[in-house]
């Protein structure tokens, strides 16, 4: 397919999508440290989106559940565990013992990550509104 075969409206929509994604992620100089961490590679970004989806759906997120959120084709089990543990060490994700079993770990976003993510969602929505004006 050649670009000349794509209608003008579709080209404009595609360019708007690219602009929105880049300006609210990797090209955003004001990105907080937490979002930069999760936007460093595809796996981390996929993990962030899946993790926040589950959290916002009020699902309990155990270690096994957290590392199963992203398909295996994106990262090995070791990489998935490393990213989770690194996010905990950096203070982006909070780890606590389960009320049911002491050995079971439960995860939730820290206040920092939650605030950064909500602001990120707001800026993405704001970008869409600005483009519509």
Predicted regions located by residue number:
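Alpha-helix N-cap/helix-initiation sites
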Residues: 37-44, 59-60, 77, 81
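A short, conserved structural fragment
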Residues: 88-98
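Short acidic, hydrophobic short linear motifs in intrinsically disordered regions
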Residues: 57-71
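Short, Lys/Arg-rich nucleic-acid/phosphate-binding segment
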Residues: 97-106
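Short amphipathic alpha-helical interaction segments
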Residues: 74-89
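Short, amphipathic alpha-helical interaction segments positioned at domain boundaries
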Residues: 111-133
């Amino acid at each position: 397919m050649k670009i000349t075969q794509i209608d003008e409206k579709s080209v404009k929509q595609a360019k708007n999508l690219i602009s929105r994604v880049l300006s609210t992620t990797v090209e955003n100089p004001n990105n907080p440290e937490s979002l930069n961490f999760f936007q460093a590679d595809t796996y981390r970004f996929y993990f962030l989106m899946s993790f926040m989806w589950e959290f916002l759906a009020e699902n309990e997120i155990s270690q096994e559940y957290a590392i199963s959120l992203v398909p295996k084709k994106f990262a090995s089990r070791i990489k998935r565990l490393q990213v989770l543990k690194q996010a905990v060490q950096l203070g982006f994700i909070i780890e606590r013992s389960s009320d049911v079993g002491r050995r079971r770990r439960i995860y939730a976003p820290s206040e920092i990550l939650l605030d950064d993510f909500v602001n990120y969602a707001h800026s993405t929505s704001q970008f869409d509104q600005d483009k519509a004006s």
